[in-house]
Amino acid sequence: MNIPLVELTSRRRRGKPLLLGLATMTMAAVGTISAAWFGGYRINLTPSEPLGLWRIVKIDRPSAVGDLVFICPPRTSAMREARMRGYLRAGLCPGGIAPLIKSVIAVAGQRVEVGVSVNVDGHPVPSSALALRDGQGRPMKPFSGGIVPTDYVFLHSPFSGSYDSRYFGPIPAAGILGLAQEVLTYAP
């Protein structure tokens, strides 16, 4: 079948604006996502803190009690097991784990006691009851307690199902990416 040259050229011209539009939208989307990523924006899909858009705000001081932080957990057997059990999501931190959003409730030199719930320097931490088993009935092993070492932090989330320092103990403060700032969030 012969298609006249004029008709073939006309079809090519009609397809070019569509391709150009798709390419432009794709580049704009990639640019926006890249700018957001490098600007410190992250999406939280875990129930430990409100769902939605968060921002990592750099800090130029040591972390303090009360700071809500983004932190990369260390590469430990406890973290690998937590990832395998589904407590932690995949991400870009060492060990392939996503950063955690948690509150710092104890810093170096503070005494943490873990029993039915958590006490820091003899003061009870609200919403810190321990779970003996996870949602699938598997046993949970709590941290035994002790003094938070130098350059470490003890983390907590008030969400009852949170996997935090109640179970894995203090972790290196060097993993802190920055303060966690809510941008556009929703607390279910």
Swiss-Prot record:
Q: Which InterPro entries match?
A: LexA/Signal_pep-like_sf, Peptidase_S26, Peptidase_S26C_TraF
| Keyword set, alphabetical order | Conjugation, Periplasm, Plasmid, Signal
Q: Which GO terms describe its cellular component?
A: periplasmic space
Has the keyword Signal been applied to this entry? yes
Signal peptide limits: 1-28
GO molecular function per UniProt:
serine-type endopeptidase activity
Alphabetical GO biological process terms: signal peptide processing
Xref: Pfam families = Peptidase_S26
Subcellular location per the Swiss-Prot or TrEMBL entry: Periplasm
The record ties this protein, via NCBIfam families, to: PRK13838.1, TraF_Ti
Which family does the UniProt entry place this protein in?
Answer: Belongs to the peptidase S26C family.
Its function, per the record, reads:
Involved in conjugal transfer of the plasmid.
Name this protein carries in UniProt? Probable conjugal transfer protein TraF
Q: Which organism is it from?
A: Sinorhizobium fredii (strain NBRC 101917 / NGR234)
